[in-house]
């Protein structure tokens, strides 16, 4: 269910236009890089069109509220939207210093040409942020993350949660 009072933003890799406002399915943006120009607030949603494939990074920092999370997910019908990181990326999706955020119904891939230390699919980072509340990761298909096989610090991971600093 869509939280009341929020703004939906839409991204459509096939039919979108980065010069549009992104505020409706008909005026969807084309690229994930366009989403870096907005501030997501309580009740807002960032929705990627199903059956779309995005080559790029999804980087989000958002502060929702209890009962009014920021939702990053999918719209339309068909398979989950797929985000494939560029070759030398350490992550595909970065959720940084956020509260009350739900990430759902996405396919996340970070293959790269060769194995790489610290490569991950979804990275949740809290840095000098204190306590982060209610980060929900749901119905994600994370696969082909070609990270290092080291099973300690420096290894690869599908989901990596890091809390450092104060």
Where are the regions that the model predicts?
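Acidic Gly/Asp/Thr-rich repetitive segments characteristic of extracellular carbohydrate-active
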Residues: 11-49, 53, 59
């Amino acid at each position: 269910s869509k939280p009341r009072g929020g703004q939906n933003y839409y991204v459509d890799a096939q039919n979108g236009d980065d010069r549009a406002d992104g505020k409706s399915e008909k005026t969807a943006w084309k690229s994930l890089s366009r989403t870096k120009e907005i501030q997501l607030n309580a009740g807002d949603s960032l929705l990627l069109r199903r059956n779309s494939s995005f080559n790029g990074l999804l980087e989000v920092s958002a502060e929702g509220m209890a009962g009014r999370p920021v939702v990053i997910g999918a719209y339309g019908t068909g398979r989950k939207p797929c985000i494939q990181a560029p070759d030398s990326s350490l992550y595909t999706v970065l959720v940084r210093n956020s509260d009350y955020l739900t990430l759902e119904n996405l396919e996340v891939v970070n293959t790269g040409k060769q194995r790489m230390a610290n490569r991950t699919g979804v990275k949740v980072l809290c840095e000098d942020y204190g306590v982060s509340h209610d980060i929900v990761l749901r119905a994600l298909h994370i696969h082909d993350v070609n990270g290092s096989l080291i099973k300690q610090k420096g290894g690869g991971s599908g989901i990596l949660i890091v809390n450092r600093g104060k």
